[in-house]
């Protein structure tokens, strides 16, 4: 919400509600699919799962090659020189896009904010970690008008430093530099974001017009934002700055603010700090008729070379710029950090007005403060102005107490903004082990910290001895496999959270998640803890093993035994080095969003789940970062191992449960079986012998999709072949190790 945010057309005087025009911002015509475009498979069969989603960034698309190591290149970078060059760009105004007040700081803050601010907690998608703002749809969102210019201003810096700095890092770093150049002391900064080279399909909303809201609010009478969305409005980062659906109601806007910032993992104080801090700099742009603004970058003529929103109002730039349609300068010191945002907010009474572009905003009442706000290009002074969402900070009891306290204690605001800004920029990056550079501060609670290894690790002999103890403990193969999967399977590749490291399976809230079968964990974990304690008490040389490591090792031992029982000798790679986090270093509320509503790998779904199970399986595979073949072999192997939730027999197509066989695929593809939906159990299918009618198997959609979907059937056929039983075991073990090590960034 810093600097410009996209405006919607203001409510019409006779109704007080937002316009129902094609796009609420008249400057941004809403694009529509061409009616005569060739139909895709998705158009013809929209309910089929799209396995290609599991391969979003193919190696062939990367011009730097598979061997490129960003961390290695970054190590060659002079970060102080980079900072100096970014600040130089920021303070050197260009005629083709003149800088407000001679400083692009506000623009760069908005660019960084709008890159990082797409992050959402429910599925970990969004954020600035891959440089996605360069691509559609983000590069053409109404909320990102003119950020194409910000990135273009940075091109000389990117060109100079080349592969040593990614676009993803540079976009985020520029905003941090902007704050520092204007006198703000930041909390820290980490590099380490690697670029991708093509856009990723993310469901930002089901609306088919910019600034639509109808599909994300179910219309039940309650304003309840559907999951997993993080914004109230299609094409905006958070909320409509004019108020919900363009109705200028600061109290209603505050409710939306709280919801959307909460979905980005921000509490009330962090939310207020970000708004106050971000709006302490720069201005918004709504100099004239927004109908004179041209199409977004993706729809702009080829000769504009990737720049969009070309305006024919006056010069189209500088004093004539139109970005959001709002024309607000928040403070008398727009290029300097101080407390004048709050001094201005509370120093005047406010009345509703409209910008020159017709957008709702507030101005100081009765002409108070006229001339106290400087013009960005040396013109006459202006009156104080605020967005509807700024007034929310004063009028809403949610934020009033917080901001009034900061009015009297600006040092508390500075501290809160520094930490909230750091969190905003880094929330999607995962643990600090992924961070690069000299300015990384100590780990924060929201980063799910794990302690460092402070002891010698187990060696190969220790690993072998521990495997023997685990297998002799009385715990079964399914118990050991399910426990390891419960730990490692919590990982989300989107925001690098979850996983086995930290041993948080033994802590709240994960220990009580329904998917993890708490009653089973109560049987398994004490046995593993006793093995751990006995080893740590007797091992030579101070060697120790964490419970996090032992959980993974025990699952790997079970896989080896299951392979041996199927006739194959194979070693499952194990890399020690995980540590055990404490309950105090685990934010229970933050971890709650990781709880799976379904996990098709374990054939689990919460009772009453309405979404198609096969779609939820694909989503779980996406979050784990596994490919189509890996998802296929994992499901088949886990069924053979008996790793279903609750010991269910659905999909266990074998008379040798516990042995790592390819029986799942062989029997699924057997044409001697006829499948029908069960008449007695919801979401269950029954496989009957075609000749006798006898019941042979039961299954869910998580199982049958591998015979139904043409892409997955092709993969299943590979693993069902007589000559690929060994390949099945090898591929399962490789995929298993990948999942177990997903969060071991120290190994990568």
UniProtKB/Swiss-Prot annotation:
CDD domains in UniProt: catalase_peroxidase_1 (cd00649), catalase_peroxidase_2 (cd08200)
Cross-link (Tryptophyl-tyrosyl-methioninium (Trp-Tyr) (with M-264)): 113-238
Keywords assigned: Heme, Hydrogen peroxide, Iron, Metal-binding, Oxidoreductase, Peroxidase
Active-site residues per Swiss-Prot or TrEMBL entry: 114 (proton acceptor)
Enzyme class, UniProt record, top EC level: oxidoreductase
Binding locations of heme b: 279
Site (Transition state stabilizer) residue list: 110
Region feature (Disordered): 1-43
UniProt xrefs under Gene3D superfamilies: 1.10.520.10, Peroxidase, domain 2 (1.10.420.10)
Cofactors (names): heme b
GO term, biological process aspect, one: hydrogen peroxide catabolic process
UniProt xrefs under SUPFAM superfamilies: Heme-dependent peroxidases (SSF48113)
GO molecular function, one term: catalase activity
Cofactor binding remark: Binds 1 heme b (iron(II)-protoporphyrin IX) group per dimer.
Domain of life: Bacteria
InterPro entries membership: Catalase_peroxidase (IPR000763), Haem_peroxidase (IPR002016), Haem_peroxidase_sf (IPR010255), Peroxidases_AS (IPR019794), Peroxidases_heam-ligand_BS (IPR019793)
Pfam family for this entry, one: peroxidase
UniProt feature, compositional bias: Polar residues: 1-20
Record-stated family: Belongs to the peroxidase family. Peroxidase/catalase subfamily.
Subunit and partners: Homodimer or homotetramer.
Designated name of the protein: Catalase-peroxidase
């Amino acid at each position: 919400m810093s600097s410009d945010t996209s405006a919607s057309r203001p409510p019409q005087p006779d109704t007080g509600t937002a316009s129902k025009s094609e796009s609420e911002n008249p400057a941004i015509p809403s694009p529509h699919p061409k009616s005569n475009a060739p139909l895709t498979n998705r158009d013809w069969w929209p309910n089929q799962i799209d396995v290609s989603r599991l391969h979003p960034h193919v190696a062939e698309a990367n011009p730097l090659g598979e061997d490129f190591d960003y961390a290695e290149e970054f190590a060659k970078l002079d970060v102080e020189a980079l900072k100096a060059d970014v600040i130089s760009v920021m303070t050197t105004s260009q005629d083709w896009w003149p800088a407000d007040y001679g400083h692009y700081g506000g623009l760069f803050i908005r660019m960084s904010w709008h890159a990082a601010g797409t992050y959402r907690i429910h599925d970990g998608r969004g954020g600035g970690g891959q440089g996605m703002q360069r691509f559609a749809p983000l590069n053409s969102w109404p909320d990102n008008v003119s950020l194409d210019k910000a990135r273009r201003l940075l091109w000389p810096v990117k060109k100079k430093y080349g592969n040593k700095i990614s676009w993803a890092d540079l976009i985020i770093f520029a905003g941090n530099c902007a704050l520092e150049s204007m006198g703000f002391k930041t909390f820290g900064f980490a590099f380490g974001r690697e670029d991708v080279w093509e856009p990723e399909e993310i469901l930002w909303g089901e609306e088919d017009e910019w600034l639509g809201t109808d599909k994300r609010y179910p219309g039940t009478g309650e304003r309840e934002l559907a999951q997993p969305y993080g914004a109230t409005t299609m094409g905006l980062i958070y909320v409509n700055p004019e108020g919900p659906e363009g109705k200028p109601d600061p109290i209603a806007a505050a409710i939306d603010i709280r919801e959307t910032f909460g979905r980005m993992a921000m509490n009330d104080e962090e939310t207020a700090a970000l708004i106050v801090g971000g709006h302490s700099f720069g201005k918004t742009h709504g100099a004239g008729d927004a109908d004179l603004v041209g199409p977004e970058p993706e729809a702009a003529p080829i000769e504009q070379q990737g720049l969009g929103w070309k305006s024919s109002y006056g010069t189209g730039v500088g004093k004539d710029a139109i970005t959001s349609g709002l024309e607000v300068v928040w403070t008398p010191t727009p290029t300097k950090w101080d407390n004048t945002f709050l001094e201005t907010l509370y120093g005047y009474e406010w009345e509703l007005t409209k910008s020159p572009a017709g957008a709702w905003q507030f101005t100081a009442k009765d002409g108070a403060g006229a001339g106290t706000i400087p013009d960005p290009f040396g013109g006459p002074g202006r009156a104080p102005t605020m967005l509807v969402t700024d007034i929310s900070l004063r009028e809403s009891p949610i934020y009033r107490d917080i901001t009034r306290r900061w009015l009297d204690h600006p040092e508390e605001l500075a501290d809160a903004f520094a930490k909230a800004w750091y969190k905003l920029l880094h929330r999607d990056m995962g643990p600090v082990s992924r961070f690069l550079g000299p300015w990384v501060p100590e780990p924060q609670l929201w980063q799910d910290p794990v302690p460092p290894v402070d002891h010698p690790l187990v060696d190969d002999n220790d690993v072998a001895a521990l495997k023997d103890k685990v297998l002799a403990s009385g715990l079964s193969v399914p118990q050991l496999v399910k426990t390891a999967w419960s730990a490692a399977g919590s990982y989300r590749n989107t925001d690098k959270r979850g996983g086995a490291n930290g041993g948080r399976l033994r802590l709240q809230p994960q220990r009580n998640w329904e998917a993890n079968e708490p009653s089973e964990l109560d049987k398994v974990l004490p046995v593993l803890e006793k093995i751990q304690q006995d080893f740590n008490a007797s091992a030579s040389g101070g060697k120790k093993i964490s419970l996090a490591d032992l959980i993974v090792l025990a699952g790997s031992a079970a896989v080896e035994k299951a392979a041996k029982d199927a006739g194959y000798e194979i070693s499952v790679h194990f890399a020690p080095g995980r540590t055990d986090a404490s309950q105090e270093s685990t934010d229970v509320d933050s971890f709650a969003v990781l709880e799976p509503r379904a996990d098709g790998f374990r054939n689990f779904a919460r009772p009453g789940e309405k979404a198609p199970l096969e779609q939820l399986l694909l989503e779980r595979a996406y979050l784990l970062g596994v490919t189509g073949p890996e998802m296929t072999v994992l499901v088949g192997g886990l069924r053979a191992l008996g790793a279903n939730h609750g010991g269910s027999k659905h999909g266990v197509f074998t008379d040798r449960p516990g042995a790592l066989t390819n029986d799942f695929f062989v029997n699924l593809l057997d044409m001697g079986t006829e499948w029908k939906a069960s008449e007695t159990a919801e979401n269950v299918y029954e496989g009957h012998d075609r000749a006798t009618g006898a019941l042979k198997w039961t299954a869910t959609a998580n199982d049958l999709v591998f015979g139904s979907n043409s892409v997955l059937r092709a993969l299943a056929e590979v693993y069902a072949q007589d000559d690929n039983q060994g390949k099945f075991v090898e591929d399962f073990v490789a995929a298993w190790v990948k999942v177990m090590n997903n969060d071991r960034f120290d190994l990568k």
